Regions:
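Catalytic phosphate/nucleotide-handling subdomain of diverse soluble enzymes
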Residues: 93-129
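Metallocofactor- and cofactor-centric catalytic cores in central/energy metabolism, strongly enriched
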Residues: 28-43, 57-60, 64-65, 290-293, ...
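Internal maturation/activation junctions in enzymes
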Residues: 50-53, 78-82, 115-211
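Conserved phosphate/anionic-ligand binding catalytic regions in large, soluble enzymes, centered on
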Residues: 81-108, 316-319, 323-324
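Catalytic alpha/beta core of large soluble enzyme barrels
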Residues: 55, 59-63, 70, 164-318
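N-terminal low-complexity, intrinsically disordered segments
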Residues: 44-82
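Short, small-residue-biased leader/transition segments that mark boundaries at the very start
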Residues: 3-8
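Glycine- and acidic
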Residues: 20-35, 79-90, 142-149, 249-256, ...
Length: 334
């Protein structure tokens, strides 16, 4: 039996920044301490919810059909979510890894090391949603972000992943001693999650989408580190939670890339390399950029276009504008 719930790393960062803003002495170590404090509170809250789930699901939503397909519920006379089976797959999905990792890296570089911004100025920028401060916003955004090999943001992503996994796996739920499986999966709701989130230190405006699952943000690698699907695949493989609960890789490839000689072989090699590096799930679309943009502008003109969203497929025309936009945003044409 399985169930899943999300832990919002972006909210832990938000509350951590608010805590730090109220302090007279501010440093990166204190921000990390406050971030981990709130992240732990969120994980414990989800665990408590699973204890409650274990007690009430058999009364409110028994698995009448699925119970018949498992060994245990009939023999024990118990619903699968209440002791009827030996294995309960209770998941916690972390989200916005890149949003948080890039934010920590931007603070470390621009505030702590280079001192191009003070802590007070950083908080002012966040509180005013970067109003009239585009230069400073871009300065925070244009660091070597998560996904760039050897970047400080990548180091932060691994550190955050490790702490989050330890919180999930370090102890079972308090009441019924249920084990939790950590993962990193935003289920496509990056706009919904970002809508109520204030500006973040990675240059993201208030209300903008957060990053997908454990993926780098679109456009993460520029200049020397030319953007490529390989860098994205490596970053996602590097930050897997490690217990089988997936952290998906979205690959949206222009058909022009695979129509050239060797293109298909290169794509097959990328898929195999990602899986061998520890990847757990690939959501892939191969469609021309021109067709995708036209379908986004006029979905009804392309009623038969099917796309992989995130963990499931759907007719592109059936998706909301926000869901279509995230597919366009992550589209890879380089």
């Amino acid at each position: 039996s399985s169930a899943a719930s999300d832990v919002y790393k972006r909210q832990a960062l938000h509350y951590g920044l608010k805590d730090l803003q109220a302090q007279e002495t501010r440093d990166l170590d204190l921000l990390w301490e406050r971030f981990t404090y709130h992240l732990q509170a969120m994980v414990e809250c989800v665990k408590a919810g699973y204890d409650k789930h274990y007690e009430v699901m058999q009364r409110n939503r028994p698995e009448i059909v699925l119970n018949l397909f498992m060994h245990g519920p009939i023999e024990r006379g118990l619903n699968c979510s209440n002791g009827g089976v030996d294995i309960l797959d209770l998941n916690i999905d972390g989200i916005a890894l890149a949003t948080v990792a890039d934010s920590f890296a931007a603070i470390e570089q621009r505030v702590v090391e280079e001192k191009k911004l003070t802590w007070d100025r950083l908080f002012e920028l966040l509180d005013t949603n970067y109003e009239g401060a585009e230069r400073e916003r871009l300065m925070l955004k244009n660091i070597r972000r998560f996904g760039s090999p050897g970047s400080r943001a990548q180091d932060w992503a691994v550190r955050i992943r490790d702490y989050y996994v330890a919180l999930c796996k370090g102890s079972p739920t308090r009441k019924h001693h249920l084990m939790i499986v950590p993962g990193l999966f935003s289920h496509g709701d990056v706009y919904a999650y970002g809508k109520t989130l204030e500006a973040t230190p990675n240059g993201r405006f208030a209300g903008d989408a957060i990053s997908h699952s454990s993926e780098p943000d679109p456009g993460f690698a520029r200049g020397v580190d030319t953007f490529s699907p390989v860098l994205k695949a490596n970053a996602v493989a590097l930050t897997q939670a490690g217990y089988g609960n997936s952290a998906p890789l979205h690959l949206d490839i222009d058909t022009g890339l695979i129509q050239h000689s060797g293109g298909v072989d290169a794509l097959v090699a990328l898929i195999h390399a990602h899986e061998q590096a520890g990847g757990t799930l690939i959501n892939m679309n191969c469609v021309s950029k021109e067709k995708l943009l036209k379908a986004h502008e006029d979905p009804k003109a392309y009623p038969d276009l099917v796309v992989r969203v995130t963990g499931y497929s759907a007719f592109f025309a059936s998706l909301s504008k926000e869901y279509r936009q995230q597919i366009v945003d992550r589209f890879l044409d380089e």
